[in-house]
C-alpha cells in the first residue's frame, strides 16, 4: 500500500447528523448534496468538519438496509433547525489516510487500509465506528465528482 497512514488521537466529538438508509456510493453523495448541505447552509454550519459513518458492510447487509450517518460537528446546546439527530463520536486512536478520488474509487481505498495496511501494522480494529472525515478545507469538484476526505479506522494494540 502506497498511501501514507497517520495515527491520530481524536477527541470525543459532538455531532448533529442525518441518517441515509439505502445503498452506499452515489446515493450517499446525493444525500449530502440534496439534504445535508442545504441544511448546513441554513444553520450556518458550512465551515465545520464533517464526518460520514457507514454502519454496515454491503457484502453482508442488503444494500437497501445499509445505514450511513452524515454528521457535522455541533455542540449539544446549539439550536439547529430540521430536527437533526445528535450523538458524540467516540475519541481514541485512529489510523487515517487521505483519499482523493470519486465515489466509485473510495471502496478500494478502504480495502487498501483495512486489507493492506492494517494486517502488517501491529494494530487491530476496535469497536468504534470507521469514519470518513471531511476537513473544512476538503475539496469537492461537482464537475468531475472528485472529492477529498480522510478515511479513518479505529485501532488498538494487538
Predicted regions and their residues:
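A solvent-exposed interaction/effector surface
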Residues: 1-158
Amino acid at each position: 500500500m502506497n498511501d501514507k497512514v497517520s495515527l491520530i488521537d481524536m477527541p470525543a466529538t459532538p455531532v448533529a447528523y442525518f441518517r441515509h438508509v439505502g445503498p452506499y456510493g452515489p446515493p450517499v453523495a446525493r444525500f449530502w448534496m440534496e439534504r445535508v448541505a442545504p441544511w448546513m447552509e441554513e444553520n450556518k454550519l458550512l465551515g465545520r468538519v464533517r464526518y460520514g459513518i457507514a454502519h454496515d458492510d454491503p457484502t453482508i447487509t442488503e444494500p437497501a438496509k445499509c445505514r450511513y450517518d452524515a454528521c457535522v460537528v455541533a455542540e449539544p446546546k446549539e439550536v439547529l433547525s430540521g430536527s437533526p439527530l445528535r450523538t458524540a463520536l467516540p475519541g481514541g486512536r485512529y489510523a487515517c489516510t487521505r483519499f482523493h478520488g470519486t465515489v466509485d474509487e473510495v471502496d478500494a481505498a478502504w480495502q487498501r487500509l483495512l486489507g493492506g495496511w492494517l494486517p502488517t501494522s501491529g494494530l487491530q480494529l476496535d469497536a468504534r465506528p470507521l469514519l470518513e472525515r471531511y476537513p473544512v478545507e476538503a475539496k469537492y469538484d461537482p464537475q468531475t465528482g472528485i472529492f477529498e476526505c480522510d478515511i479513518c479506522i479505529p485501532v488498538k494494540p494487538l
